[in-house]
């Protein structure tokens, strides 16, 4: 399911299935086994996982695990997470933005345009409070606050058969051929959707107030609906990101999206499959906080509304069997094995 130009697996990557064998080989055997290639399998969504307390090293390791990526000089849109004026993990960490931009430039991209529609205030105001304009100037990024786009730069996405009453409006530049890279955080979400990762980050590409359907409040429709999780997934039919980087160095294990209980997995995930990366993210959140009081623990991973609907819409991997974890070391492989187990398991029965 690779969707990147010249995107190939790294020969040194370790899959979860390989790890199960290698764990019994000892240090020497593990080093030797890493030189081999995995047996031929059915197509999988590649999901790179890196663990490192140093953010830049974790980002670099995860992205390098995905192998050779060449954007062919194409201009890119970059969707990070600037939903509120609160610091990471509520919003994108400035070091993450800087590291990802550096990686994209090393992989032969053209101009990079950072786009956003913040949910908890004016995008420009939130950017100012977070110091985004200054950082964008240092990184030579174009900035586009979607709140300020005129009507002629929006288009209607009808989404037939969805839970949206009259579809949605998205910027004209956004379609399934757009070269868009996404940086998402990982957190629980107490206002709806239960969790926020890649699928939910796409809501920041949808108009709050209609330009073509003048004055219509799309976000009121979303947040008042009992089908909010499904609607979040349905928005993702409007486009297909070429690459997603999930910064889970810190997460909100409860609360969210702007504040909550902090946990520190020190993990970065990268993939071209937003469903696979969100499934792994949900599993990672469940590791941070066990027990039925954690809403994510009450359903199996793929029974979460966002992921269930995303799988129905064929937006990405539909089970752990369609994912292939790539890791660089035994520590990462052990975590990947844990995550895969959580993704596969059924929820515990209520007592």
What residues fall within each predicted segment?
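N-terminal and secondary-structure boundary signal
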Residues: 2-351
């Amino acid at each position: 399911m690779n969707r990147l130009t010249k995107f190939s697996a790294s020969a040194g990557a370790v899959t979860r299935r390989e790890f199960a064998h290698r764990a019994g080989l000892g240090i020497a055997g593990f080093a030797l086994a890493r030189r081999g290639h995995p047996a031929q399998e059915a197509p999988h969504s590649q999901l790179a996982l890196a663990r490192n307390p140093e953010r830049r090293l974790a980002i670099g390791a995860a992205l390098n695990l995905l192998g050779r990526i060449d954007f062919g000089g194409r201009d890119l849109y970059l969707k990070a997470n600037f939903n509120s004026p609160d610091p990471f993990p509520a919003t994108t960490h400035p070091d993450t933005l800087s590291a990802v931009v550096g990686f994209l430039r090393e992989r032969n991209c053209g101009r990079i345009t950072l786009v956003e529609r913040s949910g908890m205030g004016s995008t420009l105001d939130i950017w100012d409070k977070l110091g985004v304009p200054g950082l964008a100037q240092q990184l030579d990024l174009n900035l586009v606050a979607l709140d300020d786009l005129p009507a002629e730069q929006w288009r209607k996405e009808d989404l037939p058969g969805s839970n949206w009453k009259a579809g949605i409006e998205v910027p004209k530049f956004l379609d399934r051929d757009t070269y868009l890279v996404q940086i998402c955080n990982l957190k629980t979400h107490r206002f709806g959707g239960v969790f926020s990762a890649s699928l939910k980050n796409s809501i920041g590409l949808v108009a709050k107030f209609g330009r073509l359907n003048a004055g219509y409040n799309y976000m009121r429709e979303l947040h008042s609906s009992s089908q909010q999780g499904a609607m979040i997934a349905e928005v993702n039919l409007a486009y297909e990101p070429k690459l997603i980087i999930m910064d889970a160095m810190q997460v909100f294990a409860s609360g969210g999206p702007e504040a909550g209980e902090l946990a520190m997995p020190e993990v970065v995930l990268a993939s071209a499959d937003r469903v696979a990366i969100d499934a792994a993210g949900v599993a990672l959140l469940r590791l941070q906080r066990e027990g039925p009081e954690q809403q994510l623990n009450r359903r199996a991973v793929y029974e979460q509304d966002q992921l269930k609907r995303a799988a129905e819409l064929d937006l990405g991997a539909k089970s752990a069997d369609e994912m292939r974890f790539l890791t660089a070391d035994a520590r990462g492989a052990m975590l990947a094995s844990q995550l895969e187990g959580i993704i596969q398991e059924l929820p515990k029965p209520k007592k």
